[in-house]
């Protein structure tokens, strides 16, 4: 089980990303638009830098919903390899069975 503080910190980051997503996208569009004057694009860059660091999507870490583990994460199932093996062997995940041949 991961530290509760790490899991909560990641949840706070997810909330910040949602809150600032529109503003961040608008500013990024201005910065990337080559047709706009350089001064306006520079102002947008400064305003983008003033946003909280944790409002950037790259700061979010994919974590297992069962254990909170950050590594060995399967995106489709939103869980780690260890939780997948445990729940799969117990038959609690539909369609997952232990392989035997």
Curated annotation (Swiss-Prot):
Belongs to the universal ribosomal protein uS14 family. InterPro entries: Ribosomal_uS14, Ribosomal_uS14_bac/plastid, Ribosomal_uS14_CS. The keyword rRNA-binding applies. Pfam families: Ribosomal_S14. One of its GO terms (biological process) is translation. Binds 16S rRNA, required for the assembly of 30S particles and may also be responsible for determining the conformation of the 16S rRNA at the A site. HAMAP family: Ribosomal_uS14_1. This is Small ribosomal subunit protein uS14. Part of the 30S ribosomal subunit. Contacts proteins S3 and S10. Coiled coil: none annotated. NCBIfam families: PRK08881.1. SUPFAM superfamilies: Glucocorticoid receptor-like (DNA-binding domain) (SSF57716). The lineage of its organism: Bacteria, Pseudomonadati, Pseudomonadota, Alphaproteobacteria, Hyphomicrobiales.
């Amino acid at each position: 089980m991961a530290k509760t503080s790490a899991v909560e910190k990641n949840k706070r980051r997810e909330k910040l990303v949602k809150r600032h997503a529109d503003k961040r996208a608008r500013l990024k569009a201005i910065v990337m638009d080559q047709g706009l004057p350089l001064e306006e694009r520079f102002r947008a860059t400064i305003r983008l830098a003033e946003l909280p660091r944790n409002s950037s999507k790259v700061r979010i870490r994919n974590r297992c919903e069962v254990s909170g583990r950050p590594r060995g994460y399967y995106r489709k199932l939103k869980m780690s390899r260890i939780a997948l093996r445990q729940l799969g062997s117990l038959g609690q995940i539909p369609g997952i069975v232990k392989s035997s041949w």
